[in-house]
């Protein structure tokens, strides 16, 4: 009986001790929380006084940076997908659009210039180009003929002009011979003496 009594008293004593310890811990914890809150309020007031961002402002800034980072990662992912599937990137689209705008401006400028030329009777760019190409072809042909003429002269061949003169001379001789043969045949047919018999 006394053992049971002692055991109950011991349990009761330990319960009271643990209860007081819990109360003390709770009180200390509450004091720490209060001190921390006071410290935070003081820090907040200091930040406000000296223009530093508050904890809330820091949180907002951090969230904004995280959103920005997520957006950049999304753009990088999209860029990689476009690259993988051969679609132009935002930058490439911008460059292409600028290039198309420049081409369009250039075409409009050329059309305007063409209209001015037409109005004032100047040859167009296309007409100038055709004229220039024609002149270049003519010049090339002349240079080729000069080169051929020099080769003929160097190797003793007659030039195109000399060939033409020679050919005309040969044709005249042939015509003359044919004429003489015809006259000879007429004389013979009508019994006149030929130039040879005369």
Swiss-Prot record:
Molecular function as annotated in GO: opioid peptide activity
Tissue-specificity statement: Expressed by the skin glands.
Propeptide, chain numbering: 21-45, 56-80, 91-115, 126-150, 161-185, 196-198
Residues with the Serine amide modification: 54, 89, 124, 159, 194
Region (Disordered): 24-198
GO cellular component: extracellular region
Main location: secreted
Range of residues in the leader sequence: 1-20
Compositionally biased residues, Basic and acidic residues: 56-65, 126-135
Record PTM D-alanine (Ala), positions in chain: 49, 84, 119, 154, 189
Family: Belongs to the frog skin active peptide (FSAP) family. Dermorphin subfamily.
Name under which the protein is recorded: Dermorphin-2
Source organism per UniProt: Phyllomedusa sauvagei (Sauvage's leaf frog)
């Amino acid at each position: 009986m006394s053992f049971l009594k002692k055991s109950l008293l011991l349990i009761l004593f330990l319960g009271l001790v643990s209860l007081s310890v819990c109360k003390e811990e709770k009180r200390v914890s509450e004091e720490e929380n209060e001190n921390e809150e006071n410290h935070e309020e003081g820090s907040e007031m200091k930040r406000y006084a000296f223009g530093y961002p508050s904890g809330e402002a820091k949180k907002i800034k951090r969230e904004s940076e995280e959103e920005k980072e997520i957006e950049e990662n999304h753009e990088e992912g999209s860029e990689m997908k476009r690259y993988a599937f051969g679609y132009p990137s935002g930058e490439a689209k911008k460059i292409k659009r600028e290039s198309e705008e420049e081409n369009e401006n250039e075409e409009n400028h050329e059309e305007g210039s063409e209209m001015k030329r037409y109005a004032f009777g100047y040859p167009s760019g296309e007409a100038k180009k055709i004229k220039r190409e024609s002149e270049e072809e003519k010049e090339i042909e002349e240079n080729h003929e000069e080169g051929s003429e020099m080769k003929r002269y160097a190797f003793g061949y007659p030039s195109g002009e000399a060939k033409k003169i020679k050919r005309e001379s040969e044709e005249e001789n042939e015509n003359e011979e044919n004429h003489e043969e015809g006259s000879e045949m007429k004389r013979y047919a009508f019994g006149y003496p030929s130039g040879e018999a005369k």
